[in-house]
Amino acid sequence: HNYNARLCAERSVRMPFLDSQTGVAQSNCYIWMEKRHRGQASAPGQLYTYPSRRWRKKRRAHPPEDPRLSFPSLKPDPEQMLKKEGLIPPDGSSLEALLRSDPIEKRIIPDPRDDDSLTEFPTLSRSARKRILEPDDFLDDLDDEDYEEDTPKRRKGKSKGKGIGGARKKLDAAALDDRDKPYACDICGKRYKNRPGLSYHYAHSHLVDEEGAGAEDKEDSQPPTPIMHRSEEQKSKKGPDGLALPNNYCDFCLGDSNTNKKSNQPEELVSCSDCGRSGHPSCLQFTPVMMAAVKTYRWQCIECKCCNICGTSENDDQLLFCDDCDRGYHMYCLSPPVAEPPEGSWSCHLCLDLLKDKASIYQKQS
């Protein structure tokens, strides 16, 4: 109780601060009243009434704008031209005065005025700063965005700060998009969250004319856009058939096609068509039927696996894998849909039509 009382008392008297417990920026909410603030009850069931404080936004004391930051008029007058000469640095003003044969008085008069304007600026800013820090003002209720938006406009007087902020926001949004969707199509630049989505896009959009596009990209010595430059780097990792170049080693035993380090026997590698990772069928625990089936389609590893019907890898916890061909299917994409994964082995409709009674689902049940 004492700790909470001290914490609440500290929050009531301190300036806005970042609470380390909740991570919230605490501000003075003016809910703490004293006995002298009590008034008579105005409605049945009330004991006291307290005066309400109407919220008002702080009227900022803007320092006088430096005339050097003001926009020039469209039709310059002779008097304004003389004023501008006083605002130019000393070397430039004296040089122009000599060239125009102006008297020395015109060069001397603007100097103290500039000095006064420069000396008045910090004094006014100090007084404005004192007024900002007064406890009676309601600056606590102002958002930080008010300061961030108004301060650059008052200081520079140009729209340059706004443009920079907008460009920075666009860059941040682009960086977030790149981070959320790291896999980009090397032909059209479309981005995906995972590699299976990108491979599905390749298979249905660019697989037919990928060879011709690859030949045209090789002729260009200097690609016009960074996307095309990135596409050439990615195309170098793909074969002429659009498949990823396979690794020459097994991801599980680190052996190659000549030696399986688990069995010390030569064994052919099976490679993923999307990422190029390879593995021995025995390391992948493939059956002989599955070893023959994976050679007939674009096989995908477990990390790149997507549904053979909808082509996406979303809801991978709903994917069923065929025990005969290792294809993946969403349980809700099947016809009819399946609510729970079946017990034992399961065969897809393609393997049931091809293998008939030799499918794994019948072998396990018999």
Swiss-Prot record:
Cross-referenced SMART domains: PHD, ZnF_C2H2
Chain residue ranges for the region called Disordered: 41-94, 140-167, 211-243
GO terms for biological process, alphabetical: apoptotic process; nervous system development
GO CC terms: cytoplasm; nBAF complex
Basic and acidic residues biased stretches: 76-86, 229-240
GO molecular function, one term: zinc ion binding
Pfam families the record matches: DPF1-3_N, PHD
CDD domains recorded: PHD1_DPF2_like, PHD2_d4
Compositional bias (Acidic residues): 140-149
ZnF (C2H2-type) intervals: 183-206
Zinc finger (PHD-type): 247-307, 304-354
UniProtKB keywords: Apoptosis, Cytoplasm, Metal-binding, Nucleus, Repeat, Transcription, Transcription regulation, Zinc, Zinc-finger
Subcellular location: Cytoplasm; Nucleus
Function: May be a transcription factor required for the apoptosis response following survival factor withdrawal from myeloid cells. Might also have a role in the development and maturation of lymphoid cells.
Protein family membership: Belongs to the requiem/DPF family.
Protein known as: Zinc finger protein ubi-d4 B
Organism in which the protein naturally occurs: Xenopus laevis (African clawed frog)
Taxonomy of the source species: Eukaryota, Metazoa, Chordata, Craniata, Vertebrata
